[in-house]
UniProtKB/Swiss-Prot annotation:
Native species: Oryza sativa subsp. japonica
PANTHER family in UniProt: TREHALOSE 6-PHOSPHATE PHOSPHATASE, TREHALOSE-PHOSPHATE PHOSPHATASE 5-RELATED
Pathway: Glycan biosynthesis; trehalose biosynthesis
Gene: TPP5
Protein name as catalogued: Probable trehalose-phosphate phosphatase 5
Enzyme class: hydrolase
Length: 349
């Protein structure tokens, strides 16, 4: 275990000079770290089944023979490295939604985030610019998250809404909204292909089609395994009439998207530029995600040579990310730790 109260105490000790304040910080830090260690030990077990939401607790990811540490070390155990990288830098936090902020569930309409996770994201956004980058439509993600303090990029980054707030918290914040939709010309086509996919999958029990505005998701999580190939066949048959669209795979989902040079990595770069936070020397972007599409963002951060990609996965796998977390139960811990550390750094001495 590399997370230690002493590490955090030494860092905050450099910031505070008042004996009373430092003593209080030490006490709070010990309590927080002790609590986090307990949560980490609990979260090391497999997720418990959630009957109401339809989550069965099992992983649908491919396992490998390698241990987790041989592929990506735990972001919690190596939190000191993350904080060391963030010293004297502006942290920007990017988060996937499904499988990261919420559990993967059988019914996509029931992928609710916990109240604890929502409160954590809301709190961390007070200290760091925070964005959610999801394959879902932007409106649908907002309906799940319900936070106005953060930025949203839906449709795998093809629908970005950035609201820039005044930094003076003592006055009412005024916002300048920037909407970016690089696949806008495909909107009518996506609507058409969505209708076609709904029609051809009607006969396949368990298959569902989700129109995410600039992309379409065909979910086969509830389809009998013997019919998975059939799902792929009907999707490919429909796409024969739409040569400018492509299909990619996710976690028991087929994603139909425009064939343009845009992905979650491009969305991250766009948001960093829009926020005027694209200086790799002074900014540390952190991206947390669980899906194959998040690898594009991990790759961008790796190529910047000053970013931190964190893969969410219950099983070890090769990734462009630097660290791993094992599910939403661990994801919720990292922002808490970042948030607490940031709060200490900005307290007056």
């Amino acid at each position: 275990m590399k997370i230690s109260a002493n590490f955090l105490l030494n860092n905050c000790a450099r910031t505070y000079t008042k004996k009373k304040t430092l003593k209080k910080c030490k006490r709070e830090l010990v309590e927080v770290v002790d609590g986090l260690v307990g949560v980490m030990m609990t979260s090391s077990n497999r997720e418990k089944p959630d009957i109401e939401s339809g989550y069965d607790g099992s992983s649908d990811e491919d396992s490998t023979e390698n241990s987790r540490a041989e592929i990506c070390p735990s972001a919690l155990c190596f939190f000191d490295q993350i904080v060391a990288s963030a010293q004297d830098k502006k942290v920007v936090l990017f988060l996937d939604y499904d499988g990261t902020l919420s559990p993967i569930v059988n019914d996509p309409e029931k992928a609710f985030m916990s109240s604890e996770m929502r409160a954590t994201v809301k709190s961390v956004a007070k200290h760091f610019p925070t964005a959610i980058v999801s394959g879902r439509s932007r409106d649908k993600v907002f309906d799940f998250v319900k936070l106005t303090e953060i930025y949203y990029a839906g449709s795998h980054g093809m629908d970005i809404l950035a609201s820039f707030a005044d930094s003076d918290s003592t006055i009412e914040k005024t916002k300048e909204t920037k909407l970016f939709q690089p696949a806008n010309e495909f909107l009518t086509m996506i609507t058409e292909v969505s209708k076609s996919l709904i029609e051809v999958t009607k006969a396949i029990k368990g298959a569902t089609v989700e129109n995410n505005k600039f992309c379409v998701s065909v979910h086969y999580r509830n389809v009998d395994k013997k019919n998975w190939k059939l799902v792929a066949q009907v999707v490919n048959n429909v796409l024969k009439d739409f040569p400018s669209l492509k299909v990619s795979t996710g976690r028991k989902v087929l994603e139909v998207r425009p064939m343009i040079n845009w992905d979650k990595g491009k969305a991250v770069e766009f948001l960093l530029r829009s926020l005027e936070l694209d200086d790799s020397e002074t900014v540390l972007p952190i991206y947390i995600g669980d899906d194959k599409t998040d690898e594009d963002a991990f790759k961008v951060l790796r190529e910047r040579k000053n970013g931190c990609g964190i893969l969410v996965s219950q099983v070890p796998k090769k990734s462009e990310a630097f660290f791993m977390l094992r599910g939403p139960s661990e994801v919720v811990i990292l922002p808490v730790m970042l948030n607490f550390f940031a709060a200490l750094l900005i307290m007056p001495s």
